[in-house]
Amino acid sequence: MLRTHDLGSLRSEHIGQTVTLAGWVGRRRDHGGVAFVDLRDASGVSQVVVREEEVFHGLRNEYVLQVIGTVSQRPEGNENPALATGQIEVIAEKVTILNTSDPLPFQIDEHVEVGEEARLKHRYLDLRRPGPARNMRLRSEANRVARELLHRDGYVEIETPTLTRSTPEGARDFVVPARLAPGSWYALPQSPQLFKQLLQVGGFEKYYQIARCYRDEDFRADRQPEFTQLDIEASFVEQDDIISLGESIVKALWQLIDVEIPTPIQRITYADAMARYGSDKPDLRFGLELTELTEFFKDTNFGVFKAPYVGAVVMPGGASQARRALDAWQEWAKQRGAKGLAYVLFKEDGELAGPVAKNLTDTERAGLADAVGAKPGDCIFFAAGEKTPSRALLGAARVEIGHRTGLINPADWAFCWVVDAPMFEPAAAAVASGDVAVGAGQWTAVHHAFTSPKPEFMDSFDKDPESALSYAYDIVCNGNEIGGGSIRIHERDVQERVFELMGLDKADAETKFGFLLEGFKFGAPPHGGIAFGWDRVVALLAGVESIRDVIAFPKSGGGYDPLTQAPAPITAQQRKEAGVDFKPEAKKADPGATKA
């Protein structure tokens, strides 16, 4: 046995005991023939006193040691209340160097700032630092809590395939060549969606797994090409059943950081979320809401406001902003694809100022403050144009205002469910936002193609797709979507109608989803589920900005791995064996055939 005790476990009750310890040299301090070594392992740090000069002079940071010694009370005045082991020290009797270390690319110290590229390139060193190590252990605890809760509720953990066929699910697949079937390819799953539905057909009425998922998306901030979901599906359930389960999971997870989340969590419809907050994942830690002014400006002479939608959001105290700050808002808006962000300053004397104010009628000027709830000293920002992008711009401005003015308390937690989302959206809009349309039709699914319409739209969703609402529900925390689910389609004819609307005829649907449609022929039960974005959930629990901080070996921008330098070319032999360059032989003409 290389050690008898963990370094972080030693306490006053161990005084007088001989112990064998193992760990890394954290810090070393020489004091006239005596060295004090902070020895660190996964459990914590203990101070080791080394009196042999020939031993301690050869020690360097991150050397790996085995120490045999006696636990002793620290001299009075030398206690360290910052350490759990701060009452004791270990007097070394034998020190063995188990391994040495080269000079480090950065210090193993959470108080030292280290660039992300260096951290990811040497991630194994970064994980020795207290912060990253704490995040990994918190993630493990979150896994444990979820598993225990679901196990108590009768859920069965089942692993689904990570090599499957390519099926359109809203993003691009990562594809893998099938060596034994040249010209054919596997795909890595974007989610376990189809398999978990087939498990319901198979009679596993309560399923879950902590699933690895893969999406070949264009680079977006804080996205990873491979990510983790807590994936759940159940039979004979309704929306309220899954929402209740989701709330139980959230409540248990947040108890890990000593936060009690009150339940039931409030619900808001998708339509209300977009109208009031300009987002389908609203941050409810503050109450600033958008105001629609389309009716208010219906007779306006101002050309910019002659638009399908006009809306506003108020920045409290914003009238005192310098011209430079107001110009910066215009650049901020342009970075989001807008032409700018119109504004009116409501001066302390009640007068309206700014470029927009001079274009308003006396009636509009007189009624504007009341219409938007502005007070003297506030700034009113406007967006005008098509409803969806205008609301999105105002919603982003709302959050920016919340941060800039201190309306958002970072210590607060605000959850909501967003329900009754549209079932479909124009395919062109989905593609423009970076998603992949499932079929060639004019409409594609907002969530995915397997989401059931609400009962009142069951007969009409394919005739009037713009009006159809889905049985979908997303859970949002502090403006982050942390989970989403739906009641699923479980009848073959309904699923075929959805595919047809999305531009998949019966032959295409059979080719791509035939195994699912076949399963629906044999008594598929009503079912529904939810998937939590596990990386985002743990990041929120850990209080970190990026999901990269809670993933053991994350990718950097563009899906690049600085540690292994993946992706990387493969050899010509590997290409040949994998059949990457396989081309089917052209069919030879029949020499006996005659021309017509």
Curated annotation (Swiss-Prot):
GO MF annotations for this entry? aspartate-tRNA ligase activity; aspartate-tRNA(Asn) ligase activity; ATP binding; nucleic acid binding
Q: What class of enzyme is it?
A: ligase
Annotated ATP binding sites: R215, D216, E217, Q224, E481, G533, W534, D535, R536
* Keyword Manganese belongs to the record: no
Report biased composition (Basic and acidic residues) as residue ranges.
Answer: 574-590
Major subcellular site? cytoplasm
Might you report a single GO cellular component term?
A: cytoplasm
So what does this thing catalyse? tRNA(Asx) + L-aspartate + ATP = L-aspartyl-tRNA(Asx) + AMP + diphosphate
> Which Pfam family name is an example for this entry?
GAD
Which amino acids does the record list as binding L-aspartate? E169, R215, H447, R488
Query: Which InterPro entries does the record associate with it?
Result: Aa-tRNA-synt_II, aa-tRNA-synth_II, aa-tRNA-synth_II/BPL/LPL, Asp-tRNA-ligase_1, Asp-tRNA-ligase_1_N, Asp/Asn-tRNA-synth_IIb, AspRS_core, GAD-like_sf
Q: Which UniProt keywords apply?
A: Aminoacyl-tRNA synthetase, ATP-binding, Cytoplasm, Ligase, Nucleotide-binding, Protein biosynthesis
Give site residues, Important for tRNA non-discrimination. H31, G77
Which residue ranges does the record annotate as region Aspartate?
A: 193-196
Specify the signal sequence span. none
* Localization per Swiss-Prot or TrEMBL: Cytoplasm
Q: Which GO terms describe its biological process?
A: aspartyl-tRNA aminoacylation
Q: Which PANTHER family match?
A: ASPARTATE--TRNA LIGASE, MITOCHONDRIAL, ASPARTYL/LYSYL-TRNA SYNTHETASE
Family per record: Belongs to the class-II aminoacyl-tRNA synthetase family. Type 1 subfamily.
Known partners and oligomeric status? Homodimer.
Biological function: Aspartyl-tRNA synthetase with relaxed tRNA specificity since it is able to aspartylate not only its cognate tRNA(Asp) but also tRNA(Asn). Reaction proceeds in two steps: L-aspartate is first activated by ATP to form Asp-AMP and then transferred to the acceptor end of tRNA(Asp/Asn).
Q: What is this protein called?
A: Aspartate--tRNA(Asp/Asn) ligase
What is the species of this protein? Arthrobacter sp. (strain FB24)
